[in-house]
Every structure is written in structure tokens, then in C-alpha cells.
Amino acid sequence: MLKLYDCTSAPSPRRTRMFLAEKGLDYENIQVDLEKGEQLSEAYRKINPGCTVPTLITEDGQALTENAGISAYLEALHPEPALLGTTPMEKANIAAWNWRCEMGGLMSAAEALRNSSPRMKDRALPGPKNIPQIPELAERGLMKLGWFFKTMNRQLSYNEFIAGDSYSVADITGTILVDFARWVKVYPQEDQTALLAWHARMKERPSYKA
């Protein structure tokens, strides 16, 4: 059986949980307490030297530590329902929008949080090394996040889902982005009706509660 090293409160492993839920796959869930620093323990470093979550242990015992790799692996083994696209153009659009949601959205929210929260002092970046906060990066992250919500709203004004006509990994990443942005008090605006309607639809999917 698959094993997932997880932290329920963190956005990154939630992406994996939602992907697994959409695929209908069973797995063993092992919690890593980030508040207590368990990701930095010697025991966990042996599993994932990068000291991050998620880590997915495959059925043959190999460790996958990045959402991009995890989703590619699971899609290859379990192609239905397709979350990475089926045609060359679908695959391209989904990959592009997933990257935009990650880099333009999730990274902006993380930049804002990790460079401002007192609880993350000297933890401005995930991983084994302590990195000092840079307050200006928090300010920039908030601005980028607001801009990206406008981009999402524009895209969803013409498409049912982020990357087109079908639900995909881009919708998983986008859903978690909107939820994670609340941590830094950034929300979709009232006039971003397409984004708000899309997020309401996403909350109705069973995988939302994964």
C-alpha cells in the first residue's frame, strides 16, 4: 500500500491528498508534526533529506517528495480519471496553468506568510536550513497574490475549470491556493464572480475534504 507522510494543516501535502482522493486510491497516512519540527528529525531526514512534506512512499518502497513527481507517477499508474490531460494540447494547458497557480499563487502566499509570521522566524524557506525572513518579500507576495486572483477570475470567466473544460490537477492547486491565501488575509473580491463561483463548485467535490 502507498504511504503518505503528511501534515493535515499544511497546503502542500493537501495537494497530494486531493489527487489521491480524485483517483480513488487508498493509502496509509503518517502525520509529521511541523509545529514540533518532526520534519527536521534524523528519522525523517532518512526518509526525505529535504525535510519537507509530502513524501509518498510507493508500493515498492521508493520515496517521492515533490507534488509534480507524485502526480506524474500516480497518473501513469492510474490514468483514469485523467488529471494531467489526455491530448497533447490538454496536457500542455494543464501543465501551464498548474505552474501558474503554483508559482504565481501558492509561492506568493508562502512568500507572504513565511516572511512575516513570528512563528516562522528564521524559517523563511522550507527545508533543513534556517533562512532569515525578509519583510519586503512578504509585501511583494501579497501584491502578487492579489494580481493572480485577477488572472484566475479572467480565466474562469471563459472556462468551467482552470485549464479548460475538464477538472484537472490545476484545479487542485488553485483550490488550495484560494484556501491558503486566507492565512495571509487575502480573499477573492466580490466582483471576482467567476473565481468565487468556481471555488464554490470545488468545495462540493468529495476530494475537497481530503
What annotation goes with each model-predicted range?
Residues 103-201:
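GST-like fold's C-terminal all-alpha helical module
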Residues 1-132:
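GST-like domain detector, emphasizing the conserved glutathione-binding G-site
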Residues 54-57, 162, 209:
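Short beta-strand(s) of the beta-wing in winged-helix/HTH DNA-binding folds
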Residues 10, 171, 205:
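Conserved G/P- and acidic residue-centered "switch" motifs that form tight phosphate/ATP-binding loops
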Residues 21, 182, 204:
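Short polybasic/polar patches that bind polyanions
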Residues 44, 202, 208:
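An amphipathic, aromatic/His-enriched active-site/gating alpha helix that lines ligand/cofactor pockets
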